Amino acid sequence: MAAEVIAAAITDIELMKASQLGLKGIAAALAVGLTGLGTGVAEMSIGSAAVGATAENKDIFGLALLFTVIPETIVIFGLVVALLVLFS
């Protein structure tokens, strides 16, 4: 009788740990996925404007490249958050 109760408690603890790991995985995927989606939407308008401006004036290529790279740092922040969630 006591062994069955202990076995049930151990099974419940294992299920809670597995559920927690699954939720951590979902949170990490959302962190990277949503930041990637947001960056893609931002790059859509910034990239086309940068290419158009560079086509008109070749001297602003460096500035256009800088404005194109800035939104990509958002994905790096999402990746850092995902790693913190997974390994905490």
Where does each model-flagged region fall?
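Hydrophobic, small-residue-rich transmembrane alpha-helices and their short perimembrane loops
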Residues: 1-88
